[in-house]
């Protein structure tokens, strides 16, 4: 893989990942979002934040060596830069996020503090509510686009 293109897996997550890969689910969610909301989400792109103030500075498919130290980088599951609704990030949280709550909350705070509309899909919470991931995603996206969600 070329040096400039460093995806989450090739950039060090491969050795850390113990649970099931969410790749198939992310591809399915990306396709659903494109079909339903006509938004083009990118999978595993990088989001760079100012280290001191936390505001959003850069969104990039890859990160070069010089940029690595310049910004605080995050690698969200799905990201979209929409003309009408701004930057939207979708995070699919599995069991690891239930154990690393403080880190997950810090991530969410960083995204929201940077003016990003964040959709967090916690798999355990969704199952507990007897919903599907798509149903929860639909509801959260409808909130972002300004259409109320019909709840049971």
What residue spans do the PLM features occupy?
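Nucleic-acid endo/exonuclease domains
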Residues: 1-152
């Amino acid at each position: 893989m070329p040096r400039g293109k460093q995806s989450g897996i090739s950039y060090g997550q491969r050795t850390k990942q113990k649970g099931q890969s969410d790749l198939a689910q992310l591809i399915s969610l990306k396709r659903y979002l494109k079909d339903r909301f006509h938004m083009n989400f990118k999978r595993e792109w990088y989001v760079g934040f100012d280290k001191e103030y936390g505001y959003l500075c850069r969104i990039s498919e890859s990160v070069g060596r010089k940029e690595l130290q310049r910004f605080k980088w995050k690698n969200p599951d799905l990201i979209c830069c929409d003309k009408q609704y701004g930057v939207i990030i979708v995070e699919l949280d599995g069991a690891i996020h239930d154990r690393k709550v403080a880190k997950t909350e810090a991530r969410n705070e960083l995204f929201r503090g940077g003016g990003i509309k964040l959709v967090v899909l916690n798999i355990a919470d969704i199952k507990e509510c007897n919903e599907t991931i798509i149903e929860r995603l639909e509801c959260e996206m409808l909130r972002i686009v300004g259409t109320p969600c019909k709840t049971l």
